[in-house]
Structure formats: C-alpha cells, structure tokens
Regions:
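Alpha-helical transmembrane segments and their helix-start/interface "positive-inside/aromatic belt" motifs
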Residues: 4-22, 173-175
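Alpha-helical transmembrane segments of multi-pass membrane proteins
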Residues: 21-39, 160-164
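Selected alpha-helical membrane-embedding segments in polytopic membrane proteins
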Residues: 29-88
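Membrane-helix interface and helix-disruption motif detector
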Residues: 57-59, 111-122, 166-177
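Transmembrane alpha-helical segments of multi-pass membrane proteins
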Residues: 76, 88-104, 151-157
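Membrane-interface helix-boundary motifs at transmembrane edges
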Residues: 80-92, 139-146
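Membrane-proximal helix-loop-helix units in multi-pass membrane proteins
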Residues: 96-150
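Terminal transmembrane helical module of multi-pass membrane proteins
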Residues: 136-208
C-alpha cells in the first residue's frame, strides 16, 4: 500500500520544495516544446529578453501545477486511509472500478462535450494509462506488490481530477502543458515518498 507513516517535518519540506522544482523545470522545458509554433520566432530572432521572460513565465506556471499536484497527493493519502478503513479488502476493487470509469470519462464525456475527432481523447487516455502502469510497476518493485493498484489509482484518477481546469478550457496547448507536468510531479512524489519514510524511520531508531 501507499506509505502513510509520520515523516519528519524537514523531509516534508524537502518534498515540497523538490516537487516545486520538478514542476517548474518540467513545465519550462515542455512548454517550449508543446507551444513551439508560438515561441519559435523568439529563437529564430534570437530575442533573449522574450526567451527569458517566457522561460520564467512557464516556470511560474509549473510551480502552480506542482502545488496542485501536491494538494492532490496528500488528499489521496487521506482518502486511501479512509478507503482502507471503510472498504477493507474491497478497496482495491473499488479503485479498479473508479480507474476504469475515469479513463472512460476522459474519452467519452470529453468527446461528447467538445466533439471533434475521437483519436486525441483516446491518445490522452492511453498516455495516462501507460505512464500510470510504468510508474506503478516501479513503485511495486521498490516497495511491495500491494502498492500497485493504489499507485495506478493515484496516477490516473487523482491526475485527472487535478487536470480538470485545463480540460474544461479544451485548448490543446494548455491541456498538454498541464497534463505532463502533473504526471511528472505525481510520479516523482509517488516514487520518492517511501525513500523519505525510510530515512525518517532510520533517524527515529536510537543510536547504539
């Protein structure tokens, strides 16, 4: 399962700021790639001022995405604890149903709301699924197999909830500019948490 032990405050602070950095850097890099058609003239004209101002703006946007990611992460840790308490052994089954519903929602209801070609919605759902499976597999290998389903749930369901503001706008550049940093931040937090827990537990042990 996902770790819910008490982590020393300095590790929580470290997680917060390191995730901020991950969000800022990923959005800055991916922003130029995703919106290259818009920013290409800055590079062809070698306009340093516009390049730097855009870089700082994208970095700031990434910080916001990172905060959204962290709110979702800690909210899920709470939801996960309640889910285990209420559903017990059925909790994994409940999560699987919700995962499938959300993936269906990402395709069907977006297409129903905005129309257009169905393939972009399917591709987004596939990206979510593949990233979630890879990250969850790594998480399970690093911790235990019981972490696999909760990790997929977090990477799919919680990411989609965090992603809703961009989805509602339905601008392709914003949809993907928000999605990828969220996935990166969520994956980072998921894969680093147990390491921080281990360090915190080691420090709590009395020295011999």
């Amino acid at each position: 399962m996902l770790e819910e032990k008490n982590v020393k405050s300095r590790y929580v602070v470290r997680l917060f700021f390191s995730t901020l950095l991950v969000g800022g850097v990923s959005a800055a890099i991916l922003g130029f790639i995703i919106r290259w058609s818009e920013f290409e003239p800055y590079f062809t004209d070698f306009d340093i001022l516009k390049i730097l101002s855009t870089l700082f703006w994208l970095f700031g946007v990434g910080l916001i995405f990172s905060v959204v990611s962290q709110m979702g992460f800690f909210a899920y840790l709470t939801v996960h604890r309640f889910g285990l308490g209420i559903f017990r052994s059925l909790w994994n089954g409940v999560q699987i149903v919700l995962i499938l519903f959300v993936l269906f929602d990402v395709v069907y209801f977006r297409h129903r709301a905005f129309g257009g070609d169905l393939s972009p919605y399917i591709i987004d759902a596939l990206v979510l699924t593949v990233v979630a499976l890879v990250v969850s597999y790594i998480k399970a290998k690093q911790t235990n197999k019981e972490a696999f389903i909760p990790a997929i749930f977090f990477m799919v369901v919680v990411t989609v909830i965090e992603w809703v503001p961009a989805v509602r706008v339905n601008d392709d550049s914003w949809v993907h500019l928000m999605l990828f940093p969220l996935l990166i931040c969520n994956a980072y937090q998921l894969l680093i948490l147990h390491k921080l827990n281990q360090k915190s537990e080691q420090e709590k042990k009395p020295s011999k």
